[in-house]
Amino acid sequence: MRSNLCHPLKNQLPISFFLSGTIRKPIFSCSRLSISAIITKEQTQEESESKSKKEVAFSSSSSFDFKAYMIGKANSVNKALEDAVLVREPLKIHESMRYSLLAGGKRVRPMLCIAACELFGGTESVAMPSACAVEMIHTMSLMHDDLPCMDNDDLRRGKPTNHKVFGEDVAVLAGDALLAFAFEHIATATKGVSSERIVRVVGELAKCIGSEGLVAGQVVDVCSEGIADVGLEHLEFIHIHKTAALLEGSVVLGAIVGGANDEQISKLRKFARCIGLLFQVVDDILDVTKSSQELGKTAGKDLVADKVTYPKLLGIDKSREFAEKLNREAQEQLAEFDPEKAAPLIALANYIAYRDN
């Protein structure tokens, strides 16, 4: 059994559906430490557990100005996205693409990509095409997730969802266009990186969003609706793939274009896997503790849809405890790197853990 949760999956978890009229709960076999094992595991670091959130959040680098870093990187990403996706013919499809892509958002994935690149001596400009690509794909996933055939949501980033403004047909096509353009942008806009590493970036990104990544998580999520006995390992499978995979890809892409070696990339994968799950745990907590106005999207929708979430299975307190564990384990993966260069990644992990929306 592995000693921690966040090792990347060498082999995807086996999953079986029985499609004779109804879909039954997926059956998993997994040798690694599960969420339930972590949650019920006897505490061995009571002193660490008693730290306040504030102490944990700022123990990494008191001199690092994360607010300034976040504003600066978000502005750079927003400008790069606006320059990449221009208004051109056909107007409607490009307006739809830009409507969702430029609607704001935290830009966490692009920042992770840039920070990972800079950790290994790369520059923002080297990472930016990959950073923009992951944000394009993230936006596509939100556009498709909001459709009536999926979550049927009306609000995203404080604005009407794309299909409410442009119609379902255009929203689907605009999402498809963003997906395709993401790969084109990496291939044509990345400068100062070897062709071998660019090919590796394309393969990495494709895998993390396909049938072994984001799509896998989404289809299991959709097929799990109405199943009463969904457990923690089932939920973990969904979110490792649906949420964590693209966050992992964001970090790994940055590491690749930044010049990291395989051992360093492996460390960053483990870090990213932890913060990917962390992102979802916090999302689930916020969904039941914040309003739609505070979140900028429909609050409580998982509860209404009777979806399984971490608070539903663990309760709010245990979910928060699990989030703390994931954050600590994520930061442990960065212990061997230069603290000054790792400060943005540590700060981003803390931001994900303690965000309010």
UniProtKB/Swiss-Prot annotation:
Cofactor requirement: Mg(2+)
One GO BP: geranyl diphosphate biosynthetic process
Subcellular location per the Swiss-Prot or TrEMBL entry: Plastid, Chloroplast
Residues annotated as transit peptide in the record: 1-40
Positions annotated to bind isopentenyl diphosphate: K106, R109, H138, R157
UniProt catalytic activity: isopentenyl diphosphate + dimethylallyl diphosphate = (2E)-geranyl diphosphate + diphosphate; isopentenyl diphosphate + (2E)-geranyl diphosphate = (2E,6E)-farnesyl diphosphate + diphosphate; isopentenyl diphosphate + (2E,6E)-farnesyl diphosphate = (2E,6E,10E)-geranylgeranyl diphosphate + diphosphate
Record-listed Mg(2+) 1 binding positions: D145, D151
EC numbers on record: 2.5.1.-, 2.5.1.1, 2.5.1.29, 2.5.1.10
Binding site for dimethylallyl diphosphate: R156, K242, T243, Q280, K297, K307
Keywords: Carotenoid biosynthesis, Chloroplast, Isoprene biosynthesis, Magnesium, Metal-binding, Plastid, Transferase, Transit peptide
GO terms assigned for molecular function: (2E,6E)-farnesyl diphosphate synthase activity; dimethylallyltranstransferase activity; geranylgeranyl diphosphate synthase activity; metal ion binding
Keyword Magnesium set for record: yes
InterPro entries xref list: Isoprenoid_synthase_dom_sf, Polyprenyl_synt, Polyprenyl_synt_CS, Prenyl_diphosphate_synthase
A cellular component annotation (GO) from this entry: chloroplast
Function field: Catalyzes the trans-addition of the three molecules of IPP onto DMAPP to form geranylgeranyl pyrophosphate.
Family to which the UniProt record says this protein belongs: Belongs to the FPP/GGPP synthase family.
Protein name stated in the entry: Geranylgeranyl pyrophosphate synthase, chloroplastic
Origin species: Catharanthus roseus (Madagascar periwinkle)
GN (gene name): GGPS1
